Amino acid sequence: MKNIFKKLLIFMALLLFSCSPDNLTNENETITNSDSNNPGILKTSTSKISNTGTSKIWNFDNLTEWEDATQVGNPNYWIENGNLRIFANPNTWERSKVKTISSFAAGTYRWTVFVPEMGVGDMASIGAFLYNNDTHELDFEIGYGKQAIRDQLAAEPDDLIVYMTSQGYPFQSVQKKIKRGQWYNLTLQLTLTSNGRYTVSWKINDAIMATVQLSYGKTTKFKIYCSVENLQFIGDQIPQSQNYALFDAVEFKGI
């Protein structure tokens, strides 16, 4: 009888220990949108949180976790066949933008974007960028480009110009040619130096195009933007065409 009682006590102790909250972990917890079980929107954004960082993918079946950031004109964007279609109208200075509600720091940011033909000479920019304030901003901006820059780069008629810019601390802007009518992966990679400052690299289809060491670091966080804006620096005339872009996905992988 004593042996049976002892075995029963041991069994109960093991059962209680195995259910203790102290033994549970959320290291690999997957947090999904409340609609994630709906098969019609399988690409909704998910977030996987662990002790080593955060990763998120937005596939643009909806605009969950994004908000309007339009500065001039109406919000010219919608979801179309699993893409974010965003545009700016001719003969305006419209600046159509969306941004993430949350802010992010060191890691890899990637935009998958279709770059169409754009109006010849139009002051219009497709933007994929990170923004904290006007001097803490890291950009991809794609447009027809001013003729002087096109001449300098020996651009062909089917070339567009991509500007890869740090707006401050320090300021740096690098211009390259890309072909219109193609999908691109645009990547900003922010790593940390030993003193906690950012080094940023601009990549197009995983090839490094530019790099700069910034004088600020991990205490500066950014919101992620997608945009089409009519901006004077990137062409020679007020836009004569409606210019647009398609964003298929945005991804962030923290470190």
Where are these regions (language model features)?
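Bacterial Sec-dependent N-terminal signal peptides
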Residues: L14-S50
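Extracellular glycan-recognition surfaces and repeat-rich motifs
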Residues: N62-L84
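Secretory/extracellular carbohydrate-interaction modules
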Residues: A88-D158
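Beta-strand-rich interaction surfaces with strong enrichment in secreted/lumenal proteins
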Residues: R95-S102, Q172-I178, L214, D236
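Ligand-recognition surfaces built from glycine- and aromatic
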Residues: T108-R110, Y216-I255
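Short, aromatic/His-centered strand-loop micro-motif at the edge of beta-sheets
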Residues: Y163-N185
